[in-house]
Amino acid sequence: LLEARSDEEVSKLLQECGYPPLDAARPEEMDAALSQAREELLADLSDSAPDPRYIDIFKLKYDYHNAKAILKAAAVGTSPERMLMDMGRVPAVELKTAVESGELDGLPGDLPEAVAEAKSVLDTTRDPQLSDIVLDRWMYRDMAQVAEVTGSEFLRGYVAAQIDAANLRALIRTLRMGKNGDFLAGVLFEGGEIEPAAVLALANDRSGLAEVYGATRFAQAAEAGEAALKGGSLTEFEKRCDDAVSDYLAGAQMIP
């Protein structure tokens, strides 16, 4: 889908994958169809999983996405409805009510502390990027805790891969924006296989990208990132990051 050259091509690809005919002139229909498919998939997986926490680790990112949308909408006095995705551990409408009322204690995992801190940062700084970083940091911490409780080494590795992808994205975006290492240090996350210090060092010496990432699953993503820094496609870089995480998940079929 990322490589599709037009909305019409996206619509055709979706139909080939079993989606109903979609009007390319109405991209909101495509978004709705994709969201519905994801909701149905997560529901099916939840019903068949021996431990719901195996699925929670994939659902909780939607809780944090919704929290971001709700907080930012409240800050500017608009409705977050069109941005909400009902695929998290908490129904979107319930999360909206909890965040707007400040009654957070009933939320699962680290969400109460995460929302409270992000709201405080947003109220103080009026900078939604900073509040998003707070929520992302809590999200990866939440994911790591869920993985740890399940005892699944595979899920621990999945969380680490997600963090490594996020840190590589942060590095390339920081360099493209011409920001310095101080900025990058504030947006890197702990918990990946690649230490934040190693990523931070690349802010001053990007020639080390191949050395840091060459022997990892992110080798191709790093190559695409280096190309993006020279005027290449950022979309291709993002796709390579996603592919690296997807390749890791593909190994799940080998887990007994």
Predicted segments with their positions:
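Extended alpha-helical surfaces
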Residues: 1-256
